[in-house]
Amino acid sequence: VSAGRDRGALAIVLHTHMPYVEGFGTWPFGEEWLWEAMAGCYLPLLDLLDEGAPLTLSLSPVLCDQLEAPDLQERFAAFVEGVRRETHSEDAAGLRAGGHEQLARELDRSWGDYERALESMRARGGEMLGSLARHAQWTSSATHAILPLLATDVGVRLQVHSGIAAHRRRFGEHWRGGFWLPEC
């Protein structure tokens, strides 16, 4: 590229989606999957975005539905303080009993990640989706459908229009035209 010419730009787009698991219990494919994603991905990502990380965020309508569910904070806290605390404690004790102190310390460290995630959630007043709102620039199809696999053009249009409408309903007119094409 010669001097004085535009060098372009780089966009890092993070797309977030979670199949609908809210209200389906915990193990093996229920809400536990959502709680783990919140603790390990969404809440740490929110901390980065709040610090000004230059990322573009895409939220699927299905994930948004789950993040605005009633009593989200209470159910997440019950998972972290109950299930996760107990399993981490038991697993760390088992590792120590087996002579694996270094692995037990790593498990103790990872428990701290869960505590920080819960603290972050509480600091946000349980408003997971509200906290993501100012960062949500892109959307996706209504149910994260793989659009080329839909049987009709009408179905494709409905998925796209419904996804955009859901985004605008939640986040106002702040949609910037970005649309993630689901692939999985």
PLM regions and their residue ranges:
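Catalytic alpha-helical scaffold of carbohydrate-active enzymes acting on polysaccharides/glycoconjugates
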Residues: 1-32, 36-177, 184
